[in-house]
Amino acid sequence: MASDERLVSERFPRSSQYHPEWVLANASGGANSLWLTEWLASALDLRPGMRVLDLGCGRASSSIFLRREFGVQVWATDLWFSAAENIQRIRDAGVEEGVFPLHADARSLPFAPSFFDAVVCIDSFYYYGTDDLYLNYLAQFVKPGAPIGIAEAGLVREIEGELPEHLRAWWTQDLWALHSAAWLKRHWERTGIVEVELAETMPNRWKVWLDWHHAVAPDNATEIKAIEEDGGRFIGYVRVVSRRRGEAKLEECCWPDSLVGGPDSH
């Protein structure tokens, strides 16, 4: 099967309208950001004019997709890809009036409290968000009742004990940041900051992952072999959708800059 054919899928009708060459040229990670954005957006009530933070947007293809498909205003925020690079891509896509690129660290964001109507994180949350204190920090930027959603590479179930043999050649230390939907749901709910509405694994998750890698990195034999041998036992795509609780109390001294001046009792 040609790579172009792999990027056209009945599962993702909106994404399939984008030219495969554009999708591949703007890939910035190990997942098809359009597929994951479409999957996540199907569980969100996105409406024209909403202010959306696309956190860890990479080359901003997810931000362009959100603007084109839903008419939202998007703050395309990333640390590893410059705003100068992303603005050119945004202009080329004809969405400069509604997508605003920003170079920023997810742990030091320059936004006002309650500025956004939604936050989405596409295949990026595991890089910065699994710290026990991070949700308290991130939630301040969305309005009470607004959604925080993630869709990313993850685990079908947590790995207990030793790493399975078939994953060892591919696995690196940073992959321990991958978690299951159930783990993320528990991690968020225990804070009382959000109400988790949805936490699940993508159906045929490993096959979608495999299709993408055959298209974008067919020479990556190590990862392709790991996905094939795993067969959906451990690795796949997950999504979690939550809403900030209106009554939730956020701790101002919790993260990140204010750690230096925390409460005296600590």
Give the location of each predicted region:
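Conserved Class I S-adenosyl-L-methionine
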Residues: 197-266
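Class I SAM-dependent methyltransferase SAM/SAH-binding core
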Residues: 53, 59-108
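A short glycine-rich, Lys/Arg-flanked "PGG" loop and its adjoining helix->strand segment in the class I
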Residues: 132-147
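A short SAM/SAH-binding and catalytic strip from SAM-dependent methyltransferases
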Residues: 118-130
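Conserved alpha-helix/loop element of class I SAM-dependent methyltransferases that forms part
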Residues: 31-48
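Short alpha-helix
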Residues: 176-192
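A short acidic, Gly/Pro-enriched loop at the edge of an enzyme's catalytic core
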Residues: 107-119
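Short, glycine-/aromatic-enriched active-site segment of Class I SAM-dependent methyltransferases
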Residues: 20, 153-175
